[in-house]
C-alpha cells in the first residue's frame, strides 16, 4: 500500500514537473519572440542608421564609423528630426515598413526602403538647416559595403555651407549587394540583399 502511494506520489510529482517545464519553455519562447518584436520606427532607425536593437542585429555588416556618427549626440538629434518629419508627412509609412519586414517579403522591403530614401530627401528639401547629397562615396560607405542609393544628410554650418559634420548620416539602403555583383541596379541582387537583411532580423 505504501509503495503504491509512493509510486503515485512520484508519478504525480513528475507529471507536475513536466507540465511546469513545458510551461516555462513556452513562456521563455514567447519572451524571446517578444524581445524581437520591433516597431516600424525601430526598423527605420536600425536599417538606415544602425541605431537601436535592430542596428545591433545587423552590426556585423555595418561600417563602425557610420554607426558612431549615427549614434553621436548630433546624429541622434538629426535622425529624431527625420523620424518626426516622416511621421507627420506620411503617418502610415512606419507601419508599412514594419509590415514589409514582418511579412518577410524582399520585394515589399525594397519598395519601402526606396520610399524611405525619398522621404529623407523630402525632409532635407524642407529643412533649411540640412542638405542632402546623392553623391556616390567609397565602397565602405555603410551597410554591407557598397551603396545602392548613396545619400548623406549634412548639417548646414555657420556660413550656410553644407558641411559633413558628425551629424552626416548615411541613408544608403543595401550595400550588401557588392558581395553578389558589381551592378547595384540588378533586381535579383537587390532581392538577395533584402532577403539577407530579413534573415538577419528574423534570426
UniProtKB/Swiss-Prot annotation:
Induction of synthesis: By Spo0A during nutrient starvation, through its direct negative control of AbrB. Repressed by AbrB during regular growth when nutrients are plentiful, in association with the transcriptional repressor Abh. Protein not detected during exponential growth, accumulates during stationary phase (at protein level).
GO-annotated molecular function: toxin activity
Superkingdom of source: Bacteria
Gene Ontology CC terms: extracellular region
Swiss-Prot/TrEMBL keywords: Antibiotic, Antimicrobial, Bacteriocin, Disulfide bond, Secreted, Signal, Toxin, Virulence
Disruption-associated phenotype: When the sdpA-sdpB-sdpC operon is deleted, increased rate of spore formation; a double operon deletion (sdpA-sdpC plus skfA-skfH) makes spores even faster. In a single gene deletion no SDP is produced.
Pro-piece positions: 33-140, 183-203
Chief localization: secreted
GO biological process: cell killing; defense response to bacterium; killing of cells of another organism
Its job: Produces a 42-residue extracellular sporulation delaying protein (SDP) that collapses the proton motive force (probably both the membrane potential and pH gradient) across the cell membrane, which leads to autolysis; may form a proton channel. Induces the lysis of other B.subtilis cells that have not entered the sporulation pathway, inducing cannibalism to provide a source of nutrients to support sporulation, and at the same time delaying commitment to the energetically expensive and irreversible onset of sporulation.
Protein name: Sporulation delaying protein C
Organism: Bacillus subtilis (strain 168)
The encoding gene: sdpC
Amino acid at each position: 500500500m505504501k509503495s503504491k502511494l509512493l509510486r503515485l506520489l512520484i508519478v504525480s510529482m513528475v507529471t507536475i514537473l513536466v507540465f511546469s517545464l513545458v510551461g516555462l519553455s513556452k513562456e521563455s519562447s514567447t519572451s524571446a519572440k517578444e524581445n524581437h518584436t520591433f516597431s516600424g520606427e525601430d526598423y527605420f532607425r536600425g536599417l538606415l542608421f544602425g541605431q537601436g536593437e535592430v542596428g545591433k542585429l545587423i552590426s556585423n555588416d555595418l561600417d563602425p564609423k557610420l554607426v558612431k556618427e549615427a549614434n553621436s549626440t548630433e546624429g541622434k538629434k538629426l535622425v529624431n528630426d527625420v523620424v518626426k518629419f516622416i511621421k507627420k508627412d506620411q503617418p502610415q509609412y512606419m507601419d508599412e515598413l514594419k509590415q514589409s519586414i514582418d511579412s518577410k517579403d524582399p520585394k515589399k522591403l525594397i519598395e519601402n526602403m526606396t520610399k524611405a530614401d525619398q522621404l529623407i530627401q523630402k525632409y532635407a528639401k524642407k529643412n533649411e538647416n540640412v542638405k542632402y547629397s546623392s553623391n556616390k562615396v567609397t565602397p565602405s560607405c555603410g551597410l554591407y559595403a557598397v551603396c545602392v542609393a548613396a545619400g548623406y544628410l549634412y548639417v548646414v554650418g555657420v556660413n550656410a555651407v553644407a558641411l559633413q559634420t558628425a551629424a552626416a548620416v548615411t541613408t544608403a539602403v543595401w550595400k550588401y549587394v557588392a558581395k553578389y555583383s558589381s551592378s547595384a541596379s540588378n533586381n535579383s541582387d537587390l532581392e538577395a540583399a533584402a532577403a539577407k537583411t530579413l534573415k538577419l532580423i528574423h534570426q
